[in-house]
Amino acid sequence: MAQVKRIRRNVSGIILLDKPLGFTSNAALQKVRWLLNAEKAGHTGSLDPLATGVLPLCFGEATKFSQYLLDSDKSYETLAQLGKTTTTADSEGEVLLTRPVTVGRDDIEAALPHFRGQISQIPPMYSALKRDGQPLYKLARAGEVVEREPRSVTIARLELLACEGDTARLSVDCSKGTYIRTLVEDIGEKLGCGAYVAELRRTQAGPFTLAQTVTLEELEQVHADGGNEAVDRFLMPSDSGLLDWPLLKFSEHSSFYWLHGQPVRAPDAPKFGMVRVQDHEGRFIGIGEVAEDGRIAPRRLIRSE
């Protein structure tokens, strides 16, 4: 007998997951997608299996805006293990070198200013970046090491929260593309003892914080009690990650033409940049960009939610 294909639901919005330890970002996404029985899903940038914390998951129409969350700033807390370096720059790798730890709080505090502001990082081999279509981590597992171009990132804040024995707990606010494993490893080299990431927790992604997240266990319990539709209550609006963008409200006439791909004028539009747009009934209908002539050109449109 042929297997009956599961009919997925057309649901839209963002669920802020507190990603559990040991899950890849995609595994967490697929689990929540199953709980929702959602037709379309995507996440907004990977967290290592070792990492926990804020992982925005986009469903339906919200996937059209995931790139803007991917580009947003992030915040982390990490526990650095001093005195050792590993193949992966975290606790999941093999130890490459062990050195004595002779530094204390004052030494760590003195080293941190070197890593604030705009800095250069060489991405780790164990990363999802690709070389000739092949993820670097696959090359690394095969024993290959390839040259990686340094990348410029911004560390807006780097603070020492605690220092105990041969560990240091750090808090970091950083730009997209920052590798906390590389940051910790570089700090360890600056201290002369080496270091790797023992724990990593993302505390903020763009406008989203840990206080807004839901755990996988909570979602599973709600699903067990009420099925797919019960999980819908955790869905945030598709534009939740864009609330700091200028908001324009179009008339019914302007909304019609704009939704058909026509640039329109808006008297209260900013002089430049991206905007989010609502129709005359207050429904989010997409994002646009202010053109040179002052009209709002549609960039990403959505169906009514």
Swiss-Prot record:
One of its GO terms (molecular function) is RNA binding. NCBIfam families: TruB (TIGR00431). It comes from Pseudomonas syringae pv. syringae (strain B728a). GO terms for biological process: mRNA pseudouridine synthesis; tRNA pseudouridine synthesis. Keywords: Isomerase, tRNA processing. This is tRNA pseudouridine synthase B. Its EC number is 5.4.99.25. PANTHER family: PSEUDOURIDYLATE SYNTHASE TRUB1 (PTHR13767:SF2), TRNA-PSEUDOURIDINE SYNTHASE (PTHR13767). Belongs to the pseudouridine synthase TruB family. Type 1 subfamily. InterPro entries: PsdUridine_synth_cat_dom_sf, PsdUridine_synth_N, PUA-like_sf, PUA_sf, tRNA_psdUridine_synth_TruB, tRNA_sdUridine_synth_fam1_C, TruB_C. The keyword tRNA processing applies.
